[in-house]
Regions:
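N-terminal Rossmann-like or analogous alpha/beta NTP/dinucleotide-binding catalytic cores
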Residues: 2-138, 232-244
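Residue-level signal for inorganic ion chemistry
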Residues: 17, 46, 77, 117, ...
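Active-site cores that bind ATP or allylic diphosphates and position pyrophosphate for catalysis
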Residues: 116-119, 123-251, 256-263, 271, ...
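Catalytic adenosine-cofactor/nucleotide-binding cores of aminoacyl-tRNA synthetases and other
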Residues: 242-398, 403-404, 460-495
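Long, amphipathic alpha-helical coiled-coil segments characteristic
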Residues: 401-431, 435-437
């Protein structure tokens, strides 16, 4: 019994008797760039499955495709898992006794098992060059002529240092496996390609390395995209050849941009890092991603990470593709922003203020206004661009069908307001300022909007603002508010 199987046995034996083996899931990304939404969802589901039953969540770096590796990508993986709270129990920097956890540091292990698989007739040496392979493909299923080589011919080619790969040997018959999402699946073995397991440079392919690692690391539940359903029968044949226990499979549906297209960074779709840069909160992103393919019981959709652990159920993962709805993420992120304390929101908003605002205004009051009105933090710059100076003067902004305003009656209203404000000494009291506008509307026998809307436009020259007339006037102060109202009066008087 090798050390890995011995460790597995020890984990199964607890106290006076046998218990179920501890659940161990893994997240095994390739360091090829930013964290895609689909990859992060795979990590999240693996984490939730493990933690729901007090299991272990393992990080493994699958870097066998050296040509695609991007410098700094491993650090992105570490940072993303840290920021999202998906703390792994074992990984490259947390040895749990199953390492190394980086595939490029496990080459001798893969080579050993590849050659052992050959001895078990589950794989064979292939000496074909690329042209032979292309020429022998039929309907994308490679028929390897090296099957016909005798043991003597193989030994001769090996002794001559003829370059080779090790390919899987697939015998006739059928392979059946069970998936927790898609149920029982049976395939004819003659539809399976005898793919390369070990390349001529000694590196394994993903299709081989993931099997060896999952077994040796005692992974009990494998979470991955449903694009791997087609390869799973080949994996199971290898498990069976080695007489290894097959893990529980959870294949999850793809995350789609729309009904026809998958999310793709190549096509400009947002990665996790992009969303964070746009001002979405980690907690909101994780909450939303959890719902991409999983439906909780009941109507509740807002879950903390600990609540997700408690409520997550594999049986409620859908087979259908999940559509990434940015509008819903905005809505959810807005809820998370509004649930922050004012102080915490203010801290998040301060970097935006520091880049834009030069006028001396009460920034905490500005945060109080903004917190109720934005969906994500990158909306802040457009919301506050009027603070230093009003935006480009445009008299058409004063026309509003709902408020029944136009440039002519807006001019009239602003003159009323200008006269009332000039003798108003309680500008620091926003309630008193509100009453001033309301009383003025009553005095002039007009609707409140006939006063409030022209004032709001005059103070900002924007059709959409973070607050109403009272809030904006209070933030700008009396002198600046009067200055801007005078500017609007001059503009409207020029007609």
């Amino acid at each position: 019994m090798d050390i890995y199987n011995f460790k597995t046995l020890l984990e199964k034996i607890q106290g006076d008797g046998m218990k179920f083996m501890k659940i161990r899931t893994r997240f095994a990304p390739s360091p090829t760039g930013y964290m895609h939404i689909g990859n992060l969802r795979t990590a999240l589901y693996g984490y939730l499955i493990a933690k729901k039953d007090d299991g272990d969540f393992i990080l493994r770096i699958e870097d066998t495709d050296q040509a695609r590796e991007v410098a700094g990508a491993i650090d992105v993986i570490y940072q993303t898992l840290s920021d999202t709270g998906l703390e792994y129990d074992e990984g490259p920097d947390k040895d749990g006794g199953y390492g190394p956890y980086i595939q490029s540091q496990r080459l001798e292990i893969y080579q050993k098992y590849a050659h052992e698989l050959v001895k078990l007739n589950g794989a064979h040496y292939c000496f074909c060059n690329q042209e032979n392979v292309k020429g022998n493909k039929e309907d994308q299923i490679f028929k390897d002529p090296c099957h016909q080589l005798s043991d003597e011919e193989i030994e001769k080619l090996l002794s001559e240092n003829k370059p080779y790969v090790i390919r899987q040997t697939i015998k006739q018959g059928q392979t059946t496996f069970n998936d927790e999402v898609y149920g029982e699946i049976t395939v004819d073995n003659d539809t399976l390609d005898e793919g390369v397991l070990l390349k001529s440079d000694g590196y394994p392919t993903y299709n081989f390395a993931n099997i060896i690692d999952d077994h040796l690391m005692s992974i009990t539940h494998v979470v991955r995209g449903n694009e791997y359903l087609a390869s799973t029968p080949k994996y199971n044949i290898i498990y069976q050849t080695f007489n290894w226990e097959i893990p529980t499979y959870i294949h999850v549906p793809p995350v789609m941009k729309d009904e026809q297209h998958k999310l793709s960074k190549r096509n400009g779709d947002a990665s996790y890092q992009d969303l964070i840069k746009q001002g979405y909160l980690n907690e909101a992103v994780i909450n939303y991603i959890a719902l991409l393919g999983w439906a909780p019981e009941g109507e509740e959709e807002i879950f903390s990470l600990s609540e997700l652990i408690k409520n997550f159920d594999i049986k409620r993962i859908s087979k259908a593709p999940a559509i990434f709805d940015l509008d819903k993420l905005k809505w959810m992120n807005g809820l998370y922003l509004r649930n922050l304390t004012l102080e915490n929101f203010h801290q998040l908003a301060m970097p935006y203020y520091q880049k834009i605002i030069t006028r001396d205004v009460d920034l905490l009051e500005l945060s109080q206004v903004l917190q109720l009105r934005i969906s994500y933090l990158n909306e802040i710059p457009e919301m506050i661009d009027f603070i230093n100076e009003p935006c480009n003067a445009d008299e058409t902004l004063f026309k509003n069908k709902k408020m029944k305003t136009n440039p002519e009656n807006s001019l009239e209203a602003l003159i009323w307001v200008r006269d009332a404000l000039s003798t108003f000494d309680n500008f620091n009291d926003d309630l008193a300022l509100h009453d001033l506008f309301i009383n003025l509307a009553q005095e002039k026998e007009v609707k409140n909007g006939r006063i409030m809307y022209p004032v709001r436009v005059a103070l900002t020259f924007k059709s959409f603002t973070p607050g109403g007339a009272v809030e904006i006037a209070h933030i700008l102060g009396k002198n600046e508010s009067l200055k801007r109202i005078d500017l609007a009066i001059r503009l409207l008087s020029m007609k």
